[in-house]
A protein has these predicted regions:
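Accessory interaction regions appended to the cores of large information-processing enzymes
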Residues: 162, 189-193, 197, 223-595
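Canonical P-loop GTPase G-domain recognition
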Residues: 123, 133-193
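P-loop NTPase switch module centered on the Walker A-proximal segment
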Residues: 1-100, 104, 144, 213-216
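Conserved short loop/turn motifs at secondary-structure junctions
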Residues: 10-11, 127-135, 172, 176-180, ...
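Switch/connector loops and helix/strand junctions flanking conserved nucleotide-binding motifs
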Residues: 35, 107-108, 133-139, 171-176, ...
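Short boundary/loop segments of OB/S1/cold-shock single-stranded nucleic-acid-binding domains
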Residues: 196-197, 209-217, 394
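Residue-level signature of catalytic and energy-coupling elements of molecular machines
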Residues: 16, 22, 54, 75, ...
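Conserved P-loop NTPase nucleotide-binding/switch module
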Residues: 86-100, 105-149
Length: 595
């Protein structure tokens, strides 16, 4: 295909502003979908966790044909925790579609991804989505985006961006608010008009950089990337250059191009197209493939440094090995090494002992998604409290800071301001919307924000919205940051929980276990209503006596116990506690069983 007929774009947006839905509609509009796929929602989010959480974790590629052109589209994650994915993707495209919600306007994570796009010199197209929402205010959003681009230092070309109004859910778009067409055609036409075709030379020797990896058991590793120059055919001999500039020979088996959601084998691919290749073992992200005649490496892709670390260790609780398939340190090590191949923002180092691993990532969500996928694969492990990664700069300790945006009802403002003060946050901006809600912007040290989310929901009675994104490394704030105020209820025996004893423990705090569960000594069974830890016995039965009771036993009614997701459990625990993760349970426990 002639490079002049190709357009490469990435879709970027804050989480939940409708990227993946937009891609669905573009696929349907262009007639690229199979009949069986029509009607299913968010087709791009193919992995189980993505469907459940309603977020995109992995960047994915698809391609649509429109008016004899091929548009390669990459759907990127909106969470800053998956920023490693975003940066690699932007190296493959020539422009970005910035999708912004018509009510919310640009959010912190919109800023994060847009900044990356501007650094690469990409020109944006603004799509104001969800214009059918009640309270939509597209003109205000347009002003906000303009201000954002200005703050990010956009050049004249980037500031003069085209705008299109759309409702991806209804599949309609238009160049003017008053002139919305019946379908997505205006958006596709705008992409052909505004996005420049790849600036490449097909006559030069072949060269491409791997910016994503995939694998299947049949062909092994699949490398995805954009051909920088030249042409590529199956069975071509190439030289692979890794990040350390070591060279080795390789042979390409298949060359596949994208068509809709399918990968289609092609006889030849030209510069400017995004392709998948197979046949080369041990490929890594950032590797350069080139023609043996002219060996030249492309500059390696940069990825942000991790900011949070936690220890993964072998599960050593009394219930170890009861419901997991993979329980040894060797199993955990192999799984983490396999994850490192495709998860570029992850780091794994040996821990204090041979059965512990220090795993670092971009944030709590990044690591909890990894733990959840290991748990589903049948792993058992113990995980420690997340810690922030500090650096030393010119003899001074620096720690990561986050930009926090909080949207809440005015009545909760006082308690949140007080709480953020205890966490060493600085208020940067405050915007009332005139309808009883207020938007607060803070810069806060990351260590103060660990464990804040669940507390925040309690303080705002579930009505607050909190979004955070990594901002910078700066000199560490002095003093301790506030942590959990209450102690915990710790079981002092092993056995089955009984409703008689749980009923009596309810006055002592909130319970984490229900009736009839197996527990062990040292397991945390509840949150104490005071600030000290309390050993309790949830297995105690009612003493039977031979004296007839007047009337009957009272009917014991237990209030519903609290169940934690992995993120909530990681936020809850303190330094002397662990989260035990197995395929069927998430338990909290003390590190030592003697107390």
């Amino acid at each position: 295909m002639n490079p002049k007929d190709i357009r490469n774009i990435a879709i970027i947006a804050h989480v939940d502003h409708g990227k993946t839905t937009l891609v669905d509609k573009l696929l349907q509009q262009s007639g690229t979908l199979d009949r069986k796929d029509i009607g299913s929602e968010r087709i791009m989010d193919s992995n189980d966790q993505e469907k459940e959480r309603g977020i995109t974790i992995l960047a994915k590629n698809t391609a649509i044909r429109w008016k004899d052109h091929k548009i390669n589209i990459v759907d990127t994650p909106g969470h800053a925790d998956f920023g490693g994915e975003v940066e690699r993707v932007l190296s493959m495209v020539d422009s970005v579609l910035l999708l912004v919600d018509a009510v919310d306007g640009p959010m912190p994570q919109t800023r994060f991804v847009t900044e990356k796009a501007f650094e690469q010199g990409l020109n944006p197209i603004l799509v104001i989505n969800k214009i059918d929402r009640p309270g939509a205010r597209p003109d205000w959003v347009l002003d906000q985006v303009f201000d954002l681009f200005d703050r990010l230092g956009g050049n004249d070309e980037q500031m003069d961006f085209p705008v299109i109004y759309a409702s991806a859910l209804n599949g309609v778009a238009g160049n003017e608010l008053e002139d919305i067409k019946e379908d997505m055609a205006p958006l596709l036409d705008l992409v052909l008009k505004e996005v420049s075709p790849p600036d490449v030379d097909t006559e030069k020797p072949f060269q491409m950089q791997i910016s994503a990896l995939d694998s299947n058991s049949y062909v092994g590793v699949i490398g995805v990337g954009r051909i920088t120059c030249g042409k590529l055919k199956p069975n071509d001999q190439v030289i692979v250059i890794d990040v350390k500039e070591d060279q080795r020979k390789g042979k390409i088996l298949q060359v596949m191009s994208h068509d809709g959601l399918e990968r289609v084998e092609v006889e030849e691919a030209e510069a400017g197209d995004i392709v998948c290749i197979t046949g080369i073992e041990n490929l890594y992200i950032s590797d350069t493939l080139c023609d043996p005649e002219k060996v030249e490496a492309l500059p390696p892709l940069s990825v942000d440094e991790p900011t949070v670390s936690m220890t993964f260790q072998v599960n050593d609780s009394p219930f170890a090995g009861q419901d997991g398939k993979f329980v040894t340190s060797r199993n955990i090590k192999e799984r983490l090494e396999q994850e490192l191949l495709s998860n570029v923002a992850l780091r794994v180092e040996p821990g204090e002992s041979s059965d512990k691993f220090k795993v670092s990532g971009r944030g709590e969500l990044h690591l909890s998604v990894l733990i959840e996928s290991m748990r589903r694969d049948g792993f058992e492990l113990g995980v420690s409290k997340p810690e922030v990664i500090q650096k030393e700069v010119d003899g001074e300790i620096h720690e990561p800071f986050e930009q926090i945006v909080i949207d809440l009802e005015e009545e909760h403002q006082g308690s949140i301001m007080e709480e953020m003060g205890l966490r060493k946050a600085e208020l940067k901006n405050m915007q009332p919307d005139g309808k009883g809600r207020i938007k607060l912007e803070f810069i806060a040290p990351s260590r103060g924000m660990i464990g804040f989310r669940s507390h925040f929901l309690t303080l705002t009675s579930g009505s607050g919205i909190l979004t955070s994104v990594f901002d910078h490394y700066g000199p560490a704030k002095k003093g301790e940051v506030t942590n959990r105020q209450n102690g915990v209820l710790v079981s002092m025996t092993s056995g089955k929980t009984l409703s008689y004893s749980l009923f009596n423990l309810q006055n002592r705090g909130k319970l984490f276990v229900g009736h009839g569960l197996d527990i062990y000594k040292g397991q945390i069974v509840g949150l104490h209503s005071r600030d000290n830890d309390l050993p309790v016995n949830p297995t105690k039965a009612k003493q039977l006596t031979n004296v007839r009771a007047s009337g009957t036993d009272e009917n014991l009614i237990l209030t519903h116990h609290i169940e934690h997701s992995i993120e909530q459990a990681l936020e809850f625990i303190e330094d002397d506690e662990l989260v035990e993760v197995t395929p069927s349970a998430i338990r909290l426990r003390k590190k030592s069983f003697t107390f």
